[in-house]
Amino acid sequence: MSTQTVALDIMGGDIGPSETVPAVVQALSLLPQLKLILVGDQHQTTALLQQHGLLTHPRVRFVHASQVVGMGDKPIVALRTLKDSSMRVVLNLVKAGEADACVSAGNTGALMAMAKCVLKSLPGVDRPALIKALPTLSGKRTVMLDLGANVSCDADTLLQFAVMGSVVAEKVEGIASPRVALLNVGEEEIKGNDLVRHSAELLRQCSALNFVGFVEGDRIFSGECDVIVCDGFVGNVALKTAEGVVRMMAQLAGYPRKKRSFLGRLAGFMFKRRFSYLNPDQYNGASLLGLRGIVVKSHGRAERHALCNAILLAAQEAKHQLPLQIADRLESVFSDRDL
């Protein structure tokens, strides 16, 4: 059984070690082949690690980092001045080959800037993209990218995103010949701006893709496609809107019982049971694709169960050697395209 080693920034995020350390315990219990390198300030974490039995755990080692990237730090400042931060160190461990992947719940902008600087892009990748798996009505998951790494893109970049997203759907989600769609304001070929229509032409001409056309925002969770491609501005707005709707529904379901009728309480109970699969914790972890290493960004407010899922995602991507798979596919697609 092959092992996967994941470097974890235990200082990152809004909550920090009080949730990342219990997440480590959970992940180790779920994945016997997992090894973890915990990176953080030893003075702040030693007691907590000892409390959870991790200081002497055979599959855990600790690396001290004297700095922490704050959630409000500017990416360029963090990149230049926080070279011994827990975030930077986990990336260095991946670059050095000591870790197969890394996870951080820290500042998204800083993580993207550091990851691009430390790990560099794969050959043929103009811009890395953030990708995330989403629940669907079919029970399967759809992957969507870009979710905020690039607020503007050209058609060639969206084609690269489509190819990378297809590899993730195949290797990580186990979907054969994944259906690829462009997010648009309508399904008809005449709909959308010049970028979307030009991108559709490129995707349609790419024999390596199973391109099925356009998908509208209200069909993202339908399960009609397996890979949804868009620029980072559109993708981030769509994702944040969906997260807000789920939070609103959850809050409505949890409305104080004494203020609800019997039918209202029954409806709330049924909602929680029927739609538990919508819990964002189950889908925590967005991957920064297109780099020479695996980087998973956990939600900044993620608690232990959600953080555990981000760790497991990183291990799964490492198991499938995702960067190598993406590099091979891109080389195949674009060498054929140049002929």
Curated annotation (Swiss-Prot):
GO cellular component term, pick one: cytoplasm
Role, per record: Catalyzes the reversible formation of acyl-phosphate (acyl-PO(4)) from acyl-[acyl-carrier-protein] (acyl-ACP). This enzyme utilizes acyl-ACP as fatty acyl donor, but not acyl-CoA.
Gene it is expressed from: plsX
GO annotation (BP), single: fatty acid biosynthetic process
Keyword Lipid metabolism attributed: yes
Subunit (UniProt): Homodimer. Probably interacts with PlsY.
Alphabetical list of HAMAP family matching this protein: PlsX
Name of the protein this chain belongs to: Phosphate acyltransferase
Keywords carried by this UniProt record: Cytoplasm, Lipid biosynthesis, Lipid metabolism, Phospholipid biosynthesis, Phospholipid metabolism, Transferase
Pathway: Lipid metabolism; phospholipid metabolism
Record family assignment: Belongs to the PlsX family.
Localization terms from the record: Cytoplasm
A Pfam family per the record: FA_synthesis
EC number: 2.3.1.274
Leader sequence residues: none
Native species: Aeromonas salmonicida (strain A449)
Repeat recorded as keyword: no
Reaction it catalyzes: a fatty acyl-[ACP] + phosphate = an acyl phosphate + holo-[ACP]
